[in-house]
A protein has these predicted regions:
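Feature recognizes metal-dependent phosphohydrolase scaffolds
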Residues: 1-307
Length: 307
């Protein structure tokens, strides 16, 4: 696989127009929305669902737009185009993809986090959104087939929240002593497709759950002891040196622990307020051509080194 150029995009929470604008900004789609990114790998870090926030005043225009189902389908279409050129478009699982399992049809949660416009699109297709997205049903199975929990591309690991010890301990390959990423994703896939039980580290929304944990991202700067502990976790993966994540919001893409951890969630979606025209967009670019990887922040004004 060619991982010379990776574009990583943080949480997009149901904002289809912002997602397409980000992809165009990163020079991987044209104005018609078709793939022009060649062998670039686009890795979106989860939380494509739930385009609303409690207490946040959305613009009327955004409130009337749907985006969830469009994003789900567009990722599949664009990935099929990218594969023909040696690239990929992959979205990993975030906590919001799994909320239909944890919260079901909790009416208060749905009122707080799901736009009526998105619910209406599912209804138009005679689909109950919550049921559709639960494990074992069509949408849950689709997520299980297409969205991994964790990815490795070169020396970079991609996960929504944080790597947890519970996930590591359950997935060590006894022959290599390293974490078996294939097993992790296979177990999660089987669960979401209704063919297996939920992995124990995903059973609840606690500290062992890698899509909910904020250990890697809750503090702007982690101390030396925390960084050393995280380094030991990363060393359990074959040839890994960095972890890229979303989940916790910042004003800009940033790093800590000497660039070992990279946080990409910058409240891209209009679910957090703002208009389409004034959102300040960012994506992470990773260039791996031998030697030390080059990290850039891509914006609509160009790109700058990530320090």
């Amino acid at each position: 696989m060619n991982f010379n150029r990776i574009v990583s995009i943080g949480d997009i929470h149901g904002d289809f127009k912002i997602f397409k604008r980000l992809l165009y900004m990163c020079n991987v789609i044209d104005k018609s929305g078709n793939w022009v990114g060649g062998s670039t790998y686009v890795i979106q870090l989860g939380d494509t669902l739930d385009g609303k926030r409690p207490g946040v005043r959305m613009s009327k225009k955004y409130a009337q737009e749907s985006g969830e189902l469009e994003i789900i389908l567009y990722i599949l279409i664009l990935d099929s185009q990218a594969k023909l050129k040696g690239g990929r478009v992959i979205s990993i699982l975030g906590n919001h993809e799994l909320y239909p399992h944890y919260f079901g049809d909790d009416k208060q949660f749905i009122r707080d986090y799901v736009k009526k416009s998105d619910i209406d699109v599912f209804k138009f297709h005679d689909i109950d959104r919550t049921t559709f997205l639960q494990p074992g049903n069509i949408g849950g199975s689709l997520l299980g087939r297409t969205r991994p929990l964790i990815l490795q591309a070169g020396e970079f690991l991609f996960i929504h929240g944080s790597i947890t010890d519970a996930m590591i301990k359950s997935n060590i390959n006894p022959r290599t002593g390293k974490v078996d990423i294939y097993k992790i994703n296979s177990d999660v896939s089987k669960w979401l497709m209704g063919k297996g039980k939920v992995p124990h580290y995903l059973e609840d929304t606690g500290k062992d759950n890698p899509v909910f944990s904020r250990v890697y991202s809750e503090a702007k700067t982690l101390n030396v002891n925390n960084c050393n502990r995280i380094r030991k976790q990363i060393d359990k993966f074959h040839n890994a040196n960095h972890v890229v994540m979303g989940h916790s919001t910042y004003s800009s893409i940033n790093t800590t622990c000497k660039r070992m951890l990279i946080r990409t969630d910058v409240s891209l979606s209009r679910a957090f307020g703002g208009e389409l025209e004034n959102k300040k967009l960012q994506a992470l670019e990773i260039l791996q051509n031998g030697g030390e990887p080059i990290l850039n922040i891509i914006t609509e004004m160009g790109k700058k080194p990530l320090k």
